[in-house]
Amino acid sequence: MFINHKHKFIFIHIPKNAGTSIRNSFDIQGYDKRVVRKPYPHNSCSEIKTYCGDLTWETFYKFAVVRNPYDRIVSYYHFHKSPQYRFPALANKYTFSDWLKRGMEDNIKRTQSDYLDIKINQIGKFETLQKDFDLFCNLINIPSYTLPKYNVSKHEHWETYYSDEDKKIVYGIFQEDFDRFGFAI
């Protein structure tokens, strides 16, 4: 998450949803921000509210980005295969299907809905990121700009990774996200 006191907004950074691009874009544009990494860089709304206090939470504009869970999990899979991950050799020994069944860590199974456990002002979608970011900038009265891309994994469209069984596994874990955010099954 990060908090910008000058423009009075809070960004809830959900993993694998372009959060690094959004956070770094504010650095590039010179916007003051305070990055909060307690207890970890990806906090739920209730954790952020506890950290920043009721007054800040109630008066600041709050936004987040969600992503189709099928696509998000493919992104996680490729991240785990990259040198950035602490155990890439472990992830590289699994096919996508095997990784879903045996290699996916519990923290990956945390739903996006869990991060957004308190109502916020705006939920954008990864699939329409620039359009939603432009709206956010307009609402907080700052000029919009093209978001840079960071940590982009190169892979085929998510649909090519999934068997019917794989889709059932992911849907079973993330059903709340599919329902709440209107993603197709």
Give the label of every model feature segment:
Residues 1-185:
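Membrane-interface amphipathic segments in extracytoplasmic regions
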